[in-house]
């Protein structure tokens, strides 16, 4: 049976950027990695009602910079920026270095795989029929300009005794084309019958040229030595 590779993992460095960008030596690498995990876990729990898409973490010169991508920036910022200041203080305490929080608004949540998956899972938890939730998500994405979308749900659908998976696709969703901009994410719906898994693939078009290259500083070239006998 043919299995599907993770669409984000196969495109890392080609059309997908890393969610954590920093360099560390052998001593600090594990601590930084665990710190990233803790920060993401903390923010996901705190901002579960803020339509969180993704969290990117950078570590420039003994500090940490966290960018929160959300469809509802007002919920994250809070009244007069009180909530975001509390988050900044908590993250600085967790990381042990000064923290900076940037907020990036997701303009079209219907074209963000994570937000679409979370929306479907919340509908399933509210006992909306799974086919209706899937079809609505697909129609909204196609209406807003997606080239293709595939939605898959798996589990005890409709309270059935035997678990199964169903999927719905519209348009093109090329899984092997590396230059294809595929946004992929998953979510879980916790229902009275058990957990229902939700997977969403959204094809937004092809990226020509890939990611911008990181230009390294060129070392001064050494003068060429003349070979003997010339």
Curated annotation (Swiss-Prot):
GO terms for biological process: translation. One of its GO terms (molecular function) is structural constituent of ribosome. InterPro entries: KH_dom (IPR004087), KH_dom-like_a/b (IPR015946), KH_dom_type_2 (IPR004044), KH_sf_prok-type (IPR009019), Ribosomal_S3_C_sf (IPR036419), Ribosomal_uS3_bac-typ (IPR005704), Ribosomal_uS3_C (IPR001351), Ribosomal_uS3_CS (IPR018280). Residues 39-107 form the KH type-2 domain. SUPFAM superfamilies: Prokaryotic type KH domain (KH-domain type II) (SSF54814), Ribosomal protein S3 C-terminal domain (SSF54821). GO terms for cellular component: cytosolic small ribosomal subunit. Keywords: Ribonucleoprotein, Ribosomal protein, RNA-binding, rRNA-binding. Belongs to the universal ribosomal protein uS3 family. Part of the 30S ribosomal subunit. Forms a tight complex with proteins S10 and S14. NCBIfam families: rpsC_bact. Binds the lower part of the 30S subunit head. Binds mRNA in the 70S ribosome, positioning it for translation. This is Small ribosomal subunit protein uS3. It comes from Psychromonas ingrahamii (strain DSM 17664 / CCUG 51855 / 37).
